[in-house]
Amino acid sequence: MLLADARRSDACQLLMSIPGVGVVTATSFIAAIEEPGNFKRSRSVGAWVGLTTRRYQSGEVDYDGHISRRGDSHLRGLLYEAATSLLTRCRAESDLRTWGLKLRERLGFKRAAIAVARKLAVIMHTMLTTGEPFRAVHAIA
């Protein structure tokens, strides 16, 4: 049933052109976002899902903490799975995968997967607003 609905939806087909993003992730993202125009910028989607770091500032102390975990935890988990799949299983080369693998060397796998998940959310929102398909090269904004 879900697969049949996704095949009929142009938006789902558009999002599923991203390596690592399947039917469940695409439909869940569309259902959670509802209307892409609700966000002023695509960058705001990462914060809305809870994939950006919390900031602590007091006096001379200023550091970024863990992710905020705001928003839809189910969608956050699906984006993390898509990022994990992109980094580990997808063999198609893309700028996003290359960027994620470089981050993995420097930060470790989990932090790199969170960063790629946030970037995926931003790219998915941009794709929904513009209607352009995923480009493996120059996908990083």
Language-model segment annotations:
Residues 1-141:
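A detector of single, family-specific signature residues
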